[in-house]
């Protein structure tokens, strides 16, 4: 099967090379469109030569240091060539090599539109807007899925050319090409072809594939093979061709489970900023101080007037109407002939009641008169009526020899007549043409909307209505002819926060009572009773959207529900060598580093395989991967987060096709003892996320014991009504250590302080300082713990020395890296290992002793070693397990091994690099994450 173009693709006009922000032109779809014989010429560009698609270059005099956007070299001398529309700057010698299309024609080059997923406004240093090519000196937006950066007021003009990370039933591909994104490379990036520097911190230059990370000059990229193999991380990436999600009614934020916490909300179709606000970046020109200039407010159709969104254009007071019209079109990146439009003046009151009538008449326009002081400052761009138009029609299926065909439509043309006319041009010699329909696709940067047109819909009237709404919107609208398919909609919804321990029928009844689910289209497909969660199969898009939005505002038995949209992994299509990585990130760990890692991993991998633990926990991820035959897990968080994920893995193991996945750790917490033992370090300190993933891929698999602690409290006499109360038994899983006494008391005090003021506990250094302060307060504390507990090891009573704390350790790291057991040889005990099936029991005499252990001056008091322990608490005592403290009532604690052992990944030792060895391109050039949300 021939390779298909990457979804979201844009082609390079005039060549078979890939367009920036997209993969190569498809050998299946072809590069250029096909015009029906007899149709007139189509205006697409005002470029200097065919090598500069869409640009309007003019020679300018340089007054400050300037760099070329093609070669990124300094422009020597006083002359350069600047595009009046998109600000592309070039040497004269580079003009003929420019293949980067102008922003004005970029939407027409998108292969398959894929909307972007913009997060919160952030400050991004030394980054550039892909629309106006200017530096991001003010808060801007960044796509959470690809490396697209854009000013807030440039968002409406950004292309819908994001990565397609799943199949959506429209045009599904099995083979992907490079998905090129222009600029914002690190200054040290090197071209894969010529090995010269291709990145720049001064201008938007160079290209990078969003999937494999290969980087090159825009000219050199044409020499690379078009097919993308996903690079160094190919075995870890969940292939987009193996993920299916019918997401018609859901935004990209919903599909990728990204919380909608944007500082500036951009509603559907509301992709701009309030025109009444000051605009500092983008295509607008600020008010000139010269008396010979004037600044005009330019609106684009009814939509921008309704939202009061305008662009500022500064022109000479002696400018002709044609010049003003060209400036207005440039402000909105409109590349059509200015003669097809007119400017209509708006009343000074701003009321648009005379819209379409007031302002410039045809007679006034023909006079060539210039705007004067009496001319209104607010104008709206209007399209002149047309008796016919050239319309591009795109095929809605693969294996077509052309990308589109162009036909002429007039007042008699309808959707049905257009379908019948273009089918033979696409090679579809079918008798039943009624099976095909015409689909209108609006390709905004944040949402791609598809509308099926009625058979009798007049196409010319439809285009007129679009232009009345927004002239720019015409360039973002396409028409596809596609076969009518009765595809049954199916959406999987994860609903968590339900009461645990119920039956499938009970959960179904509970949801029907809480959200009035429709039994005809909603069914419970999976039940996770222990976690109080279900998976709903919904066969109606409208019902799925209603349930999703309603569940987020619904509480059951006082607990709020969690709702997530989950795709389906087509596990039978996974390549044999594919072992995708399931990533869990706790954004609350490590300050803001967790959120930075979330964004980085979404871009390095498929965002469907990256889960935020504060949004549903680990269960949705394990359910998504339940049919994957082989996968690994990366947990980004502290030891408590690791324990959370391992506990969820234990509970869902029987549902997994891969019941024993190996687990790696990226430590973000305070202690990170398990991360230290497995060589992942004392804590994440800003390493390159790509290097982290490579280390996970190269890590060694090891086994680790896990332990089950049964807490069974004694009967408690109630003093109020003389009723005997019994605390129910509780089971806790342990990975690292369990402390009883003084160390648990310190941990409890720290935990309570963090709950009172969580905002202060965002750095590892501050957290350790609080531990020290709490410890100093307990330095004179004496409890005589050995008199308050009893210990049995392997059913044998063990006499305890005089201690204040008793600690059971599973790994050779305690309290942020201290060796509590010690390294001295002792014939009474075996050398500890994390997979030996034994726990070591150690005592400490107080806070001073603990401090000496932390400083490496002493070790703990070795008491016992075994696999089965019984501890009797004679009074209420502080207890902690893996950093989670509480006060345990008098009773029994039984500690025993959990089967089976868990598979962990230990970071491989770094091998010395040979001199002159080539490093992986992605490792060399991937930029570190940056940009802090406001």
Swiss-Prot record:
Family annotation (InterPro entries): ATP-NAD_kinase_N, C1-like_sf, DAG/PE-bd, DGK, DGKtheta_RBD, Diacylglycerol_kin_accessory, Diacylglycerol_kinase_cat_dom, NAD/diacylglycerol_kinase_sf
According to its UniProt record, the EC number is 2.7.1.107, 2.7.1.93
Q: In which pathway does it act?
A: Lipid metabolism; glycerolipid metabolism
The compartments listed are:
Cytoplasm; Cytoplasm, Cytosol; Cell membrane; Synapse
Ras-associating domain residues: 387-486
Keyword presence, Oxidoreductase:
no
Q: Which domain of life is it from?
A: Eukaryota
One protein family per Pfam: C1_1
GO terms (molecular function) for this protein are: alkylglycerol kinase activity; ATP binding; ATP-dependent diacylglycerol kinase activity; diacylglycerol-dependent serine/threonine kinase activity; DNA-binding transcription factor binding; phospholipase binding; receptor tyrosine kinase binding; transmembrane receptor protein tyrosine kinase activator activity
Family to which this protein belongs: Belongs to the eukaryotic diacylglycerol kinase family.
Designated name of the protein? Diacylglycerol kinase theta
Annotated organism of origin: Mus musculus (Mouse)
User: What are the top taxonomic ranks of the organism?
Assistant: Eukaryota, Metazoa, Chordata, Craniata, Vertebrata
């Amino acid at each position: 099967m021939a390779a298909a173009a990457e979804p979201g693709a844009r082609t390079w006009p005039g060549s078979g090379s890939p367009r920036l922000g997209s993969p190569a032109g498809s050998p299946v779809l072809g590069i250029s469109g096909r015009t029906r014989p007899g149709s007139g010429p189509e205006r697409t560009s005002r470029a200097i030569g065919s090598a500069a698609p869409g640009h309007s270059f003019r020679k300018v005099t340089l007054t400050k240091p300037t760099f070329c956007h093609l070669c990124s070299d300094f422009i020597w001398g006083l002359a350069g060539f600047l595009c009046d529309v998109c600000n592309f700057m070039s040497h004269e010698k580079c003009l003929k090599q420019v293949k980067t299309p102008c922003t004005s024609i970029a939407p027409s080059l998108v292969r398959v539109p894929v909307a972007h997923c913009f997060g919160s406004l952030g400050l991004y240093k030394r980054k550039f807007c892909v629309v106006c090519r200017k530096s991001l000196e003010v808060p801007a937006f960044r796509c959470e899925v690809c490396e697209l950066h854009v000013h807030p007021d440039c968002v409406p003009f950004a292309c819908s050319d994001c990565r397609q990370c799943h199949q959506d039933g429209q045009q599904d591909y099995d083979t992907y090409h490079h998905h090129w994104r222009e600029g914002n490379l690190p200054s040290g990036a090197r071209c894969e072809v010529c090995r010269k520097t291709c990145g720049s911190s001064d201008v938007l230059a160079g290209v990078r594939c969003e999937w494999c990370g290969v980087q090159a000059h825009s000219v050199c990229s044409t020499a690379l093979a078009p097919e993308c193999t996903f690079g160094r991380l190919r075995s870890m990436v969940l292939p987009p061709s193996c993920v299916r999600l019918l997401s018609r009614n859901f935004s990209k934020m919903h599909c990728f489970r990204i919380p909608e916490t944007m500082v500036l909300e951009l509603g559907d179709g509301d992709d701009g900023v309030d025109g009444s606000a000051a605009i500092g970046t983008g295509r607008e020109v600020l008010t000139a101080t010269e008396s010979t200039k004037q600044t005009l407010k330019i609106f684009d159709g009814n939509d921008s007037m309704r939202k009061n969104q305008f662009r500022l254009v500064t022109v000479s007071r002696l400018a002709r109407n044609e010049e003003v019209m060209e400036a207005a079109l440039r402000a909105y990146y409109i590349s059509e002939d200015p003669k097809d439009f007119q400017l209509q003046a708006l009343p000074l009151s701003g009321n648009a009641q005379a819209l379409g009538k007031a302002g410039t008449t045809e007679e006034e326009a023909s006079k060539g008169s210039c705007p004067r002081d009496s001319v209104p400052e607010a104008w709206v761009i209007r399209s002149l009526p047309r008796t016919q138009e050239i319309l591009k029609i795109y095929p809605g299926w693969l294996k077509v020899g052309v990308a589109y065909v162009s036909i002429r439509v007039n007042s008699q043309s309808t959707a049905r007549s257009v379908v019948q006319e273009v089918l033979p041009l696409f090679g579809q010699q079918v008798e039943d043409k009624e099976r095909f329909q015409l689909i209108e696709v609006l390709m905004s940067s944040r949402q791609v909307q598809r509308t099926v047109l009625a058979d009798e819909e007049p196409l010319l009237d439809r285009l007129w209505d679009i232009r009345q709404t927004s002239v720019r919107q015409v360039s973002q609208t396409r028409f596809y002819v596609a076969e009518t398919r009765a595809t049954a909609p199916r959406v999987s919804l994860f609903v968590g926060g339900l009461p645990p321990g119920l039956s499938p029928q009970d959960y179904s009844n509970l949801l029907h009572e809480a959200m009035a689910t429709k039994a005809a289209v909603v069914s419970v497909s999976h039940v996770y009773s222990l976690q109080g969660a279900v998976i709903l199969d919904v066969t109606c898009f409208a019902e799925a959207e209603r349930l999703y939005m309603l569940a987020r505002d619904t509480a059951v038995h006082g607990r709020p529900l969690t709702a997530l949209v989950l795709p389906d992994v087509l596990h039978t299509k996974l390549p044999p060598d594919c072992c995708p990585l399931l990533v869990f990130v706790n954004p609350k760990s490590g300050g803001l580093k967790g959120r930075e890692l979330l964004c980085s991993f979404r871009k390095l991998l498929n965002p469907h395989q990256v889960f935020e633990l504060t949004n549903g926990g680990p269960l949705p991820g394990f359910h998504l991967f339940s049919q994957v035959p082989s996968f690994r897990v990366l947990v980004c968080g502290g030891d408590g987060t690791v324990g959370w994920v391992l506990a969820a893995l234990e509970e869902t193991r029987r549902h997994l096709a891969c019941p024993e996945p190996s687990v790696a750790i990226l430590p973000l917490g305070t202690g990170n003892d398990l991360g230290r033992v497995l060589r992942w370090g004392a804590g994440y300190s800003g390493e390159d996320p790509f290097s982290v993933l490579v280390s996970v891929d190269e890590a060694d698999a090891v086994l680790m014991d896990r332990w089950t602690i049964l807490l069974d409290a004694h009967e408690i006499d109630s003093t109020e009504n003389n009723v005997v109360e019994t605390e129910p038994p509780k089971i806790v899983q342990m990975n690292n250590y369990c402390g009883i006494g003084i160390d648990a008391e310190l941990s409890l005090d720290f935990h309570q302080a963090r709950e009172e003021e969580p905002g202060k506990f965002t750095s590892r250094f501050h957290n350790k300082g609080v531990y020290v302060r709490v410890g100093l307060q307990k330095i004179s504390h004496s409890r005589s713990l050995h008199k308050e507990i009893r210990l049995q090891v392997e059913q044998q009573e063990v006499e305890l020395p005089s201690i204040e704390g008793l600690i059971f350790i599973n790994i050779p790291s305690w309290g942020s890296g201290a060796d509590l057991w010690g390294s001295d040889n002792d014939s009474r005990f075996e050398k500890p290992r994390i997979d030996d099936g034994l726990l070591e029991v150690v005592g400490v005499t107080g806070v001073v002793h603990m401090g000496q252990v932390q400083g490496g001056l002493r070790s703990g008091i070795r008491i016992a070693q075994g696999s089965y322990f019984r501890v009797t608490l004679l009074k209420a005592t502080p207890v902690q397990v893996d950093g989670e403290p509480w006060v345990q009532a008098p009773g029994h604690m039984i500690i025993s091994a959990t089967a089976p052992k868990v598979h962990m990944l230990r970071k491989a030792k770094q091998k010395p690099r040979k001199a002159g060895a080539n490093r992986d391109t992605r490792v060399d050039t991937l930029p570190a994450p940056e940009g802090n949300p406001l």
